[in-house]
């Protein structure tokens, strides 16, 4: 293999001298606590220029042409492309996904093929493990097992990805009868540092172990794979097909699992100890044992996925993003979060949605649930399978393998398929002198290279090689359109009638300039993909564009999040920090208000005054003032003219608008592929993450801030390794993974 592409120190110095990163009010602080990796040789975390260098080099070297004796001409061409990408990302005119900011260019990326993708989807039905990195020793690679989708979900969650999963009837009906109840014993050596804490959650001392001929003993290695394989063995023992010897006692030895607080190499962070895994295994065994002699339901399967997610949250990842997708007439699934005890115990771990098609009409109970608690969301698989952009019309089976979506709902996915995201801030990129068509072309090529990663699971490798799906997103959409057009994209509504129900509806009128703007950029992405695919000799991407919810990445640039409207024209935005976080002294020294967090011990809440882009424009609207109808119409605009995947949107609504939910879901059934809704709270909670304020309060609070946090932090020189992130909010629905 040839020596890779690298960016010279001289080039980086020139960019640093000529380009100023477009940090938002929370931008640099958010970057430093979320994406800056620890540099052991320097005894500090990365600076932004170092992060961007790592990320760009990690990506450009995925070009498969570099594998075999590349020409000097090719290396020069890719070096020039890397330099353009570096300048673009350093200035924050565009960024790869948060996952790429954290992982790209690391040893972990080189070891772990799945590490660059944000989110995944898997169907909960018996599947073969195939030629994957994880295959239980008792199974043949081509042998179907009930455990496989749960293993896939567990593995990807522990790698920091989010996972959407389908418990629709068509999948759950393929799971065979639960044949055996399993007597599970979890043991820990008395000499283990974790012994006392493990016993408290249900383990027993190893000296108490009673092993007989009917039992299976497995000592878990201290690895991610060991956790997955233990759970797989437990699940598969319940089924005769994968337990032909009819063994009904399982002993899992967790003595080798590293204790709480120990360092985790690779992904980063610190270990949780064996306790969350012990609780998970015992709880999953209870779910399965309760169905011995019967069959698992969609709720049982979702519970197992939620219990896995709960264990991962308690572990190193700190958030496991899950979306459970059920059948639209499965009332037990739709109402499963009404069980308050189980909701508090584990059912909080997923956002729940139902699959519909355009002929579906039963929105009344769904709308009632949304008004009550914001669930379920809606995923229209019929539209996803047969449409790209809505304006391009019906294309039968254009994405026929689609079965679900990622947790945030912006990418329609086949079984085992991941999201592959990159986002552009069009207003910022234009202000920095970029041609937007070039920016979106660079974005498409970046995402295309990610599809050449060495994926760990066979189902993923096969579908990625077939689809090469990419998701080029734009963010700060409201900022861009309001600034460039002087108005919002929806300029009004006209009266009309639904062609099927004859119900009176109000059809949105869009600014034609906006249609032209996004259409040109869509075509630039498609053209870039076509050209690069031809060069690389691979399939063109099955779909190309999306709108991701953004959140953390949008905070870097200070842009509105995805298609969402700013939460208010002026805000107090609160971020929580561990009391030991070295950023806190710098923030206090700069005049930011801080107070003890009322929800979590040893945590400080820091308040940032924020002014939205365009706040002074008379046509500015916030999430607290824009109507539910305009939000639906805006999502429909982007689904029609920009996104051939889907558009992630959490529509917020006032109490007075709740009665419009049902009719609007019905009106847009031929356009919107996925959506979710939440009541607008407006910062009424104590220490709310976002609290709208007036202009006078904003100006007063801004005057209290007297220093530059980045400069003060550098002067204090008090970096600390492996801090836990506290309460990082990536998107309205809380569905995104933390990095």
Swiss-Prot record:
Disulfide bridge positions per record: 119-419
Region (Effector region-2): 168-313
Enzyme class: oxidoreductase
GO molecular function, one term: ribonucleoside-triphosphate reductase (thioredoxin) activity
CDD domains: RNR_II_monomer
Activity regulation, free text: Allosterically regulated by ATP and dNTP.
Region ranges (Adenosylcobalamin-binding-1): 565-626
InterPro entries: RdRp_reductase_class-2, RNR-II_ins_dom, RNR_alpha_hel, RTP_Rdtase_AdoCbl-dep
Catalytic activity, reaction form: a 2'-deoxyribonucleoside 5'-triphosphate + [thioredoxin]-disulfide + H2O = a ribonucleoside 5'-triphosphate + [thioredoxin]-dithiol
Keywords: Allosteric enzyme, Cobalamin, Cobalt, Disulfide bond, DNA replication, Oxidoreductase, Redox-active center
Record-listed E.C. numbers: 1.17.4.2
UniProt keyword Oxidoreductase, yes or no: yes
Active-site residues annotated for this sequence: 408, 410
Entry cofactors: adenosylcob(III)alamin
Segments for region (Adenosylcobalamin-binding-2): 685-724
Effector region-1: annotated span: 147-158
Biological processes annotated in GO: DNA replication
Subunit architecture: Monomer.
Membership in a protein family: Belongs to the class II ribonucleoside-triphosphate reductase family.
Protein's UniProt name: Adenosylcobalamin-dependent ribonucleoside-triphosphate reductase
UniProt source species: Lactobacillus delbrueckii subsp. bulgaricus (strain ATCC 11842 / DSM 20081 / BCRC 10696 / JCM 1002 / NBRC 13953 / NCIMB 11778 / NCTC 12712 / WDCM 00102 / Lb 14)
